[in-house]
Amino acid sequence: MNTPLRAGLIGLGMMGRHHARILSQLPGVQLVAAADSSGDPHHAAANIPVVANVEQLLAHRLDYCVVAVPTADHAQIGFALAAAGIPALIEKPLAPDLATARALAVAFDAAGLIAAVGHTERYNPALRALRARLADGALGTLYQISTRRQGPYPPRVRDVGVVFDLATHDLDVTTWVTGMPLVSLAARTVARSGRIAEDLVVILGELSDGTVTSHLVNWLSPLKERVTTATGANGCLAADTVHGDLTFYANGSAKTEWAAAEVFRGVTEGDITRYAIPKREPLLGEHEAFRDAILGKDAPIVTLWQAAATIAAAEAVLTSATTGGTAAPEQPRIPRPRLASDYALATTDPSSR
Protein backbone atom coordinates (compact mmCIF):
# COMPACT_ATOMS: atom_id res chain seq x y z
CA MET A 1 0.00 0.00 0.00
CA ASN A 2 1.42 3.41 -0.95
CA THR A 3 2.27 5.79 1.86
CA PRO A 4 0.04 8.91 1.80
CA LEU A 5 1.68 12.26 1.16
CA ARG A 6 2.02 14.24 4.38
CA ALA A 7 0.46 17.66 3.81
CA GLY A 8 0.58 20.76 5.97
CA LEU A 9 -1.63 23.85 5.83
CA ILE A 10 -0.67 27.39 6.81
CA GLY A 11 -3.68 29.62 7.43
CA LEU A 12 -7.05 28.55 8.82
CA GLY A 13 -9.09 31.61 7.86
CA MET A 14 -11.96 31.96 5.40
CA MET A 15 -10.04 30.30 2.57
CA GLY A 16 -7.88 28.03 4.69
CA ARG A 17 -10.90 26.24 6.11
CA HIS A 18 -11.86 25.12 2.59
CA HIS A 19 -8.34 23.88 1.93
CA ALA A 20 -8.53 21.94 5.22
CA ARG A 21 -11.81 20.33 4.14
CA ILE A 22 -10.36 19.20 0.80
CA LEU A 23 -7.05 18.01 2.25
CA SER A 24 -8.86 15.98 4.90
CA GLN A 25 -10.70 14.01 2.19
CA LEU A 26 -8.16 13.89 -0.65
CA PRO A 27 -7.17 10.34 -1.60
CA GLY A 28 -3.47 9.66 -1.26
CA VAL A 29 -2.96 12.61 1.10
CA GLN A 30 -2.92 12.94 4.88
CA LEU A 31 -3.32 16.39 6.44
CA VAL A 32 -0.95 16.04 9.38
CA ALA A 33 -0.82 19.55 10.88
CA ALA A 34 -1.81 23.17 10.37
CA ALA A 35 -0.35 26.51 11.43
CA ASP A 36 -2.14 29.73 12.30
CA SER A 37 -1.13 32.32 14.88
CA SER A 38 -4.83 32.89 15.61
CA GLY A 39 -5.59 29.24 16.23
CA ASP A 40 -8.50 27.56 14.46
CA PRO A 41 -11.41 30.05 14.44
CA HIS A 42 -13.58 27.96 12.08
CA HIS A 43 -12.81 24.59 13.71
CA ALA A 44 -11.49 23.34 10.37
CA ALA A 45 -8.49 21.37 11.67
CA ALA A 46 -10.32 18.53 13.39
CA ASN A 47 -8.06 15.95 15.04
CA ILE A 48 -4.75 17.42 13.85
CA PRO A 49 -2.23 19.62 15.68
CA VAL A 50 -2.49 23.38 15.16
CA VAL A 51 0.79 25.21 15.72
CA ALA A 52 1.65 28.90 15.69
CA ASN A 53 4.06 29.28 12.78
CA VAL A 54 5.79 27.71 9.80
CA GLU A 55 8.87 26.74 11.78
CA GLN A 56 6.79 24.59 14.14
CA LEU A 57 4.86 23.14 11.20
CA LEU A 58 8.07 21.95 9.53
CA ALA A 59 8.70 19.62 12.47
CA HIS A 60 5.86 17.40 11.17
CA ARG A 61 7.93 15.97 8.26
CA LEU A 62 5.86 17.44 5.44
CA ASP A 63 5.89 16.26 1.84
CA TYR A 64 4.20 19.49 0.76
CA CYS A 65 2.40 22.50 2.17
CA VAL A 66 -0.59 24.67 1.25
CA VAL A 67 -0.29 28.39 1.99
CA ALA A 68 -3.56 30.23 2.64
CA VAL A 69 -2.50 33.39 4.47
CA PRO A 70 -2.84 37.07 3.48
CA THR A 71 -0.90 38.03 0.35
CA ALA A 72 1.55 40.16 2.34
CA ASP A 73 2.75 37.03 4.17
CA HIS A 74 3.29 34.83 1.09
CA ALA A 75 6.91 35.81 0.61
CA GLN A 76 8.13 35.12 4.15
CA ILE A 77 6.41 31.74 4.28
CA GLY A 78 7.26 30.82 0.68
CA PHE A 79 10.97 31.48 1.14
CA ALA A 80 10.96 29.46 4.37
CA LEU A 81 9.35 26.49 2.63
CA ALA A 82 11.74 26.69 -0.33
CA ALA A 83 14.73 26.80 2.03
CA ALA A 84 13.36 23.74 3.87
CA GLY A 85 12.88 21.79 0.62
CA ILE A 86 9.08 21.68 0.87
CA PRO A 87 6.93 21.99 -2.30
CA ALA A 88 4.13 24.53 -1.91
CA LEU A 89 0.69 25.36 -3.26
CA ILE A 90 0.29 29.09 -2.57
CA GLU A 91 -3.02 30.94 -2.71
CA LYS A 92 -3.44 33.67 -5.32
CA PRO A 93 -2.30 36.32 -5.82
CA LEU A 94 1.21 34.94 -5.52
CA ALA A 95 2.70 38.18 -4.19
CA PRO A 96 1.90 41.87 -3.69
CA ASP A 97 4.29 42.89 -6.49
CA LEU A 98 6.14 41.47 -9.48
CA ALA A 99 9.60 41.62 -7.93
CA THR A 100 8.51 39.43 -5.01
CA ALA A 101 6.66 37.03 -7.31
CA ARG A 102 9.78 36.59 -9.41
CA ALA A 103 11.94 36.06 -6.34
CA LEU A 104 9.62 33.31 -5.11
CA ALA A 105 9.68 31.60 -8.51
CA VAL A 106 13.47 31.72 -8.56
CA ALA A 107 13.71 30.34 -5.01
CA PHE A 108 11.60 27.26 -5.74
CA ASP A 109 13.31 26.70 -9.10
CA ALA A 110 16.73 26.90 -7.49
CA ALA A 111 15.68 24.31 -4.91
CA GLY A 112 14.32 22.00 -7.64
CA LEU A 113 10.88 22.03 -6.03
CA ILE A 114 7.39 21.85 -7.45
CA ALA A 115 5.36 24.95 -6.59
CA ALA A 116 2.00 26.19 -7.80
CA VAL A 117 -0.45 29.02 -7.27
CA GLY A 118 -4.15 28.63 -6.49
CA HIS A 119 -5.75 30.22 -9.54
CA THR A 120 -8.83 28.12 -8.89
CA GLU A 121 -10.80 29.40 -11.86
CA ARG A 122 -8.60 27.34 -14.18
CA TYR A 123 -10.31 24.29 -12.67
CA ASN A 124 -13.85 25.62 -13.08
CA PRO A 125 -15.70 23.16 -15.33
CA ALA A 126 -17.33 25.92 -17.40
CA LEU A 127 -14.00 27.61 -18.15
CA ARG A 128 -12.26 24.34 -18.90
CA ALA A 129 -15.01 23.53 -21.41
CA LEU A 130 -14.76 27.05 -22.87
CA ARG A 131 -11.00 26.71 -23.32
CA ALA A 132 -11.37 23.33 -25.03
CA ARG A 133 -13.98 24.64 -27.48
CA LEU A 134 -11.87 27.69 -28.32
CA ALA A 135 -8.94 25.37 -29.01
CA ASP A 136 -11.18 23.32 -31.31
CA GLY A 137 -12.07 26.45 -33.28
CA ALA A 138 -15.74 26.53 -32.28
CA LEU A 139 -15.91 30.32 -32.68
CA GLY A 140 -13.67 30.67 -35.72
CA THR A 141 -11.73 33.92 -35.55
CA LEU A 142 -11.83 35.24 -31.98
CA TYR A 143 -12.91 38.87 -31.59
CA GLN A 144 -13.32 39.52 -27.87
CA ILE A 145 -13.07 38.08 -24.37
CA SER A 146 -15.15 39.88 -21.75
CA THR A 147 -15.68 39.14 -18.07
CA ARG A 148 -17.94 40.40 -15.31
CA ARG A 149 -17.03 39.62 -11.70
CA GLN A 150 -18.97 41.61 -9.17
CA GLY A 151 -20.65 41.18 -5.81
CA PRO A 152 -20.59 42.33 -2.18
CA TYR A 153 -17.32 43.07 -0.39
CA PRO A 154 -15.76 39.90 1.13
CA PRO A 155 -14.68 40.63 4.74
CA ARG A 156 -11.81 38.12 4.39
CA VAL A 157 -9.84 40.60 2.21
CA ARG A 158 -7.95 43.26 4.15
CA ASP A 159 -4.54 43.68 2.50
CA VAL A 160 -5.18 44.16 -1.24
CA GLY A 161 -7.68 45.91 -3.47
CA VAL A 162 -10.09 44.42 -5.96
CA VAL A 163 -7.46 44.38 -8.74
CA PHE A 164 -5.11 41.97 -6.97
CA ASP A 165 -7.80 39.94 -5.21
CA LEU A 166 -10.43 39.50 -7.95
CA ALA A 167 -9.24 40.94 -11.26
CA THR A 168 -6.23 38.63 -11.17
CA HIS A 169 -8.72 35.80 -11.76
CA ASP A 170 -9.92 37.44 -14.97
CA LEU A 171 -6.49 38.48 -16.20
CA ASP A 172 -5.22 34.93 -15.69
CA VAL A 173 -8.29 33.25 -17.21
CA THR A 174 -8.17 35.46 -20.30
CA THR A 175 -4.61 34.50 -21.17
CA TRP A 176 -5.17 30.86 -20.20
CA VAL A 177 -8.30 30.20 -22.29
CA THR A 178 -6.81 31.92 -25.35
CA GLY A 179 -3.17 30.89 -24.97
CA MET A 180 -2.07 34.48 -25.67
CA PRO A 181 -0.48 37.15 -23.46
CA LEU A 182 -1.93 40.56 -22.72
CA VAL A 183 0.15 43.24 -24.42
CA SER A 184 -1.78 46.41 -23.55
CA LEU A 185 -4.08 47.45 -20.71
CA ALA A 186 -6.08 50.55 -19.85
CA ALA A 187 -8.07 50.86 -16.64
CA ARG A 188 -10.05 53.10 -14.32
CA THR A 189 -10.54 52.45 -10.61
CA VAL A 190 -12.58 53.99 -7.81
CA ALA A 191 -12.74 53.55 -4.03
CA ARG A 192 -16.24 53.97 -2.66
CA SER A 193 -16.52 51.72 0.39
CA GLY A 194 -14.28 53.71 2.73
CA ARG A 195 -11.19 51.59 2.14
CA ILE A 196 -7.92 53.01 0.87
CA ALA A 197 -7.59 50.40 -1.85
CA GLU A 198 -9.76 50.38 -4.98
CA ASP A 199 -13.02 48.45 -4.89
CA LEU A 200 -14.09 48.83 -8.53
CA VAL A 201 -12.10 48.52 -11.73
CA VAL A 202 -12.96 48.61 -15.42
CA ILE A 203 -10.24 47.21 -17.70
CA LEU A 204 -9.82 47.30 -21.46
CA GLY A 205 -7.05 45.13 -22.88
CA GLU A 206 -5.53 43.68 -26.02
CA LEU A 207 -4.05 40.23 -26.59
CA SER A 208 -1.02 39.59 -28.76
CA ASP A 209 -3.17 38.73 -31.80
CA GLY A 210 -5.29 41.88 -31.50
CA THR A 211 -8.22 40.26 -29.67
CA VAL A 212 -9.96 42.83 -27.46
CA THR A 213 -10.56 42.08 -23.78
CA SER A 214 -12.78 43.83 -21.24
CA HIS A 215 -13.30 43.25 -17.53
CA LEU A 216 -15.77 44.71 -15.03
CA VAL A 217 -14.77 43.85 -11.47
CA ASN A 218 -16.10 45.25 -8.20
CA TRP A 219 -17.01 44.68 -4.55
CA LEU A 220 -19.87 47.18 -4.66
CA SER A 221 -22.77 45.25 -6.17
CA PRO A 222 -25.45 43.24 -4.32
CA LEU A 223 -25.68 41.19 -7.54
CA LYS A 224 -23.16 38.35 -7.54
CA GLU A 225 -22.01 37.73 -11.08
CA ARG A 226 -19.21 35.60 -12.51
CA VAL A 227 -19.42 35.49 -16.31
CA THR A 228 -16.82 35.04 -19.05
CA THR A 229 -17.91 35.54 -22.66
CA ALA A 230 -15.89 34.81 -25.79
CA THR A 231 -17.19 36.29 -29.06
CA GLY A 232 -16.00 35.22 -32.49
CA ALA A 233 -16.95 34.84 -36.12
CA ASN A 234 -19.34 31.94 -35.45
CA GLY A 235 -21.13 33.28 -32.35
CA CYS A 236 -20.28 33.43 -28.68
CA LEU A 237 -19.61 31.14 -25.73
CA ALA A 238 -20.76 32.29 -22.29
CA ALA A 239 -19.39 30.62 -19.15
CA ASP A 240 -21.28 31.09 -15.88
CA THR A 241 -18.67 30.12 -13.34
CA VAL A 242 -21.00 30.37 -10.33
CA HIS A 243 -23.09 27.48 -11.64
CA GLY A 244 -20.51 25.83 -13.90
CA ASP A 245 -22.60 26.29 -17.07
CA LEU A 246 -21.38 26.87 -20.64
CA THR A 247 -23.79 28.14 -23.31
CA PHE A 248 -23.17 28.56 -27.04
CA TYR A 249 -25.05 31.29 -28.93
CA ALA A 250 -24.64 30.54 -32.62
CA ASN A 251 -24.87 33.08 -35.39
CA GLY A 252 -28.02 32.35 -37.38
CA SER A 253 -27.89 30.95 -40.88
CA ALA A 254 -31.33 32.22 -41.91
CA LYS A 255 -31.29 35.30 -44.11
CA THR A 256 -33.07 38.41 -42.86
CA GLU A 257 -35.66 39.48 -45.41
CA TRP A 258 -36.44 42.72 -43.63
CA ALA A 259 -33.83 45.05 -45.10
CA ALA A 260 -34.18 47.76 -42.47
CA ALA A 261 -33.47 45.29 -39.66
CA GLU A 262 -30.53 43.70 -41.49
CA VAL A 263 -28.74 47.05 -41.64
CA PHE A 264 -28.62 47.31 -37.86
CA ARG A 265 -28.06 43.69 -36.82
CA GLY A 266 -24.87 42.49 -38.48
CA VAL A 267 -25.48 38.86 -37.44
CA THR A 268 -28.71 36.99 -36.83
CA GLU A 269 -29.74 34.94 -33.81
CA GLY A 270 -29.18 31.23 -34.25
CA ASP A 271 -29.46 28.16 -32.06
CA ILE A 272 -28.72 28.37 -28.34
CA THR A 273 -27.08 25.32 -26.74
CA ARG A 274 -26.29 24.80 -23.08
CA TYR A 275 -23.74 22.03 -22.85
CA ALA A 276 -23.99 19.18 -20.40
CA ILE A 277 -20.57 19.14 -18.74
CA PRO A 278 -19.29 17.29 -15.65
CA LYS A 279 -19.35 19.63 -12.65
CA ARG A 280 -16.66 19.08 -10.06
CA GLU A 281 -15.61 21.49 -7.34
CA PRO A 282 -12.77 23.65 -8.74
CA LEU A 283 -10.81 23.63 -5.47
CA LEU A 284 -10.86 19.83 -5.45
CA GLY A 285 -9.50 19.80 -9.00
CA GLU A 286 -6.75 22.21 -7.97
CA HIS A 287 -5.67 19.95 -5.10
CA GLU A 288 -5.82 16.81 -7.22
CA ALA A 289 -3.57 18.44 -9.82
CA PHE A 290 -0.99 19.50 -7.23
CA ARG A 291 -1.02 16.09 -5.55
CA ASP A 292 -0.46 14.43 -8.93
CA ALA A 293 2.38 16.84 -9.74
CA ILE A 294 4.06 15.93 -6.44
CA LEU A 295 3.75 12.27 -7.42
CA GLY A 296 5.55 12.96 -10.71
CA LYS A 297 2.51 12.86 -12.96
CA ASP A 298 1.73 15.26 -15.80
CA ALA A 299 -0.73 17.60 -14.07
CA PRO A 300 -2.15 21.02 -15.01
CA ILE A 301 -0.77 23.14 -12.20
CA VAL A 302 -0.37 26.93 -12.39
CA THR A 303 3.35 27.59 -12.08
CA LEU A 304 4.84 30.47 -10.12
CA TRP A 305 6.13 31.98 -13.35
CA GLN A 306 2.64 31.91 -14.87
CA ALA A 307 1.28 33.53 -11.72
CA ALA A 308 4.03 36.17 -11.92
CA ALA A 309 2.81 37.10 -15.41
CA THR A 310 -0.62 37.73 -13.92
CA ILE A 311 0.94 39.94 -11.23
CA ALA A 312 2.66 41.90 -14.01
CA ALA A 313 -0.72 42.44 -15.68
CA ALA A 314 -2.29 43.57 -12.40
CA GLU A 315 0.52 46.07 -11.88
CA ALA A 316 -0.06 47.41 -15.41
CA VAL A 317 -3.77 47.84 -14.58
CA LEU A 318 -2.94 49.92 -11.51
CA THR A 319 -0.33 51.92 -13.44
CA SER A 320 -2.90 52.74 -16.10
CA ALA A 321 -5.47 53.74 -13.49
CA THR A 322 -2.93 56.07 -11.88
CA THR A 323 -1.57 57.69 -15.04
CA GLY A 324 -4.73 57.71 -17.12
CA GLY A 325 -2.93 56.13 -20.08
CA THR A 326 -2.33 52.61 -21.33
CA ALA A 327 0.30 50.30 -19.88
CA ALA A 328 2.12 47.27 -21.27
CA PRO A 329 2.53 44.42 -18.78
CA GLU A 330 6.12 43.44 -18.17
CA GLN A 331 6.58 39.89 -19.42
CA PRO A 332 8.38 37.78 -16.79
CA ARG A 333 10.72 35.10 -18.06
CA ILE A 334 8.67 31.90 -18.13
CA PRO A 335 10.91 28.82 -18.33
CA ARG A 336 9.91 25.80 -20.35
CA PRO A 337 7.44 23.44 -18.61
CA ARG A 338 9.52 21.15 -16.46
CA LEU A 339 9.24 17.38 -16.54
CA ALA A 340 8.56 15.40 -13.40
CA SER A 341 12.09 14.02 -13.64
CA ASP A 342 13.46 17.55 -13.30
CA TYR A 343 12.22 17.78 -9.73
CA ALA A 344 14.09 16.27 -6.84
CA LEU A 345 10.92 15.15 -5.09
CA ALA A 346 9.70 13.14 -8.09
CA THR A 347 12.42 10.57 -7.46
CA THR A 348 12.20 10.68 -3.68
CA ASP A 349 10.17 8.30 -1.55
CA PRO A 350 7.75 10.61 0.32
CA SER A 351 7.93 8.42 3.40
CA SER A 352 11.64 9.20 3.72
CA ARG A 353 11.02 12.91 4.34
Residues covered by each model-derived region:
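Rossmann-like dinucleotide-binding domain that binds NAD(P)(H)
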Residues: 154-212, 216-223, 229, 305
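Beta-loop-alpha module in the N-terminal Rossmann-like domain of NAD(P)-dependent dehydrogenases
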Residues: 19, 49-107
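Hydrophobic residues in well-ordered beta-strands that form the structural core
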Residues: 90, 115-117, 239
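Short, Asp-centered acidic motifs that coordinate Mg2+ and/or phosphate
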Residues: 33, 64, 87, 144, ...
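N-terminal Rossmann-like dinucleotide-binding module
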Residues: 1-46
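A contiguous active-site-proximal alpha/beta segment in oxidoreductase catalytic domains
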Residues: 95-157
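C-terminal glycine/acidic-rich active-site capping loop/insertion
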Residues: 120, 234-301, 305, 327, ...
